[in-house]
């Protein structure tokens, strides 16, 4: 699983790798005979609708950074490999707006970029939640201590 692929040495670390490092990974996987699969491929395999390659591997990218379009997508095309991107809905909405600052360190994919990547046949998109790890308010449908059934129903369905 990858997070951000960024060509900024001062930002590299646990969750950020360089395009060169990603290309090394892709080259190695290719040389060892691995074939990329998607979540759809795996579901179809489990449903008995398809076979998996001899050496399947799933490349996943979390959060949907714009660097997926800038740095990852060209490498996927170059190596003819597929990947799964889990995007955060609220970030995609935000960065699809006109006149928004798209700084390479933190910008996320727009709907147009997602569409282009998806239409290539190399990229599958999944949901990584709407607000990511937002702790601003409680989520879920379990009752809060002291909450009536009616209060819970109104809170969770509104």
Q: What annotation goes with each model-predicted range?
A:
Residues 7-12:
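Short, solvent-exposed loop/turn elements at domain surfaces
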Residues 21, 26-28, 75-78, 116:
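Alpha-helical scaffold elements within enzyme catalytic domains, especially in hydrolases
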Residues 21-24, 41, 67, 71, ...:
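Extracytoplasmic/secreted proteins, especially bacterial periplasmic and envelope-associated proteins
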Residues 54, 60, 68-71:
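Membrane-embedded segments
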């Amino acid at each position: 699983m990858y997070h951000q692929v960024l060509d900024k040495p001062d930002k590299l670390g646990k969750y950020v790798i360089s395009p060169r490092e990603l290309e090394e990974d892709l080259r190695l996987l290719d040389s060892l005979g691995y074939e990329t699969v998607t979540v759809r491929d795996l579901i179809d395999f489990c449903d008995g609708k398809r076979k998996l390659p001899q050496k399947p591997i799933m490349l996943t990218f979390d959060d949907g950074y714009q660097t997926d379009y800038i740095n990852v997508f060209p490498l996927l095309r170059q190596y003819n490999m597929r990947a799964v991107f889990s995007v955060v809905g609220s970030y995609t909405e935000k960065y699809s707006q006109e006149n928004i600052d798209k700084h390479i360190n933190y910008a996320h994919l727009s709907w147009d970029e997602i569409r282009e990547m998806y239409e290539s046949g190399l990229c599958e998109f999944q949901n990584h939640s709407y607000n990511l790890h937002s702790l601003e308010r409680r989520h879920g449908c379990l009752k809060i201590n002291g909450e009536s059934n009616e209060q819970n129903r109104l809170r969770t369905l509104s």
